[in-house]
Amino acid sequence: MARYLGPKLKLSRREGTDLFLKSGVRAIDTKCKIETIPGQHGARRGRLSDYGVQLREKQKVRRIFGVLEKQFSNYYKEAARQKGNTGENLLQLLETRLDNVVYRMGYASTRAEARQLVSHKAIVVNGVVVNIPSFTVKAEDTVSVREKSKTQARIIAALELADQREKPLWVEVDTKKLEGVFKRVPDRADLSAEINEQLIVELYSK
């Protein structure tokens, strides 16, 4: 399955919520009619079946993190193999992706931009250049911007934007050195309450 390259706001309208696919400079409701689904006439959403609700939740989370269908399925299988709550395990696996950590540290204004930075070898983990967006970051890993990439305008702009957002408790960033530490894997209480991971577990349990 190819990665979606179309309008980002169309995906947010499809899911009926902000997927944080844009930089966040403007509120999403000033950019599009979030309460209507995409299409020529922007029909309002009908009542979904239980399966439909579960599917939409899975698609929402998958799109927030920019993960393809096969990748997402593999993450779920790994989460189910681990001890503890499968839904929480799933979110923690997604949160430890390198592209997501780069976004959380404020080096990129969106996860898609973070994925580009990683792919273009602008990110260093523990002193080694890593260009795999799905690379798993572990507690106490150092994630920094490569020296020759530190003057990129988009990174500087992203850091300025990150100053306006609430900073995640599980990362620590030196914005002058462009060097951060992934202090710990976030707990469920740290993450968005707008995600209902139990619906995803129910979907895959069918």
Swiss-Prot record:
Q: What GO CC terms are in its UniProt record?
A: small ribosomal subunit
Domain S4 RNA-binding residue range list = 96-156
Q: Which domain of life is it from?
A: Bacteria
As one GO molecular function, the record gives: structural constituent of ribosome
Task of the protein: One of the primary rRNA binding proteins, it binds directly to 16S rRNA where it nucleates assembly of the body of the 30S subunit. With S5 and S12 plays an important role in translational accuracy.
The UniProt family comment states: Belongs to the universal ribosomal protein uS4 family.
This protein's assembly is summarised as: Part of the 30S ribosomal subunit. Contacts protein S5. The interaction surface between S4 and S5 is involved in control of translational fidelity.
Q: What is this protein called?
A: Small ribosomal subunit protein uS4
What is the species listed in this Swiss-Prot or TrEMBL entry? Colwellia psychrerythraea (strain 34H / ATCC BAA-681) (Vibrio psychroerythus)
Q: What is the lineage of its organism?
A: Bacteria, Pseudomonadati, Pseudomonadota, Gammaproteobacteria, Alteromonadales
